């Protein structure tokens, strides 16, 4: 049986670490009482083997085995480079 890996898209908010990036994943959640859709942001640490990401890039990341205390995601591809 093949294992399906969870993937997410997000924006790189930090690339200061070696071979690591911090990705902010935004999602829309409906407020339970008022019904308004509100943005919620989750920040995850991801593994970037070749240090190819820059600040502001849009990336796709996939879940993987724990690589460190906080890293359980790995970079799949860079979808869009930031316009600087």
Curated annotation (Swiss-Prot):
GO terms for MF: rRNA binding; structural constituent of ribosome
Keywords associated with the record: Ribonucleoprotein, Ribosomal protein, RNA-binding, rRNA-binding
GO process terms (BP): translation
Keyword Glycosyltransferase recorded: no
Domain of life: Bacteria
Record note on quaternary structure: Part of the 30S ribosomal subunit.
NCBIfam families, A to Z: PRK05610.1, uS17_bact
Name used for this protein in its record: Small ribosomal subunit protein uS17
Gene from which this protein is expressed: rpsQ
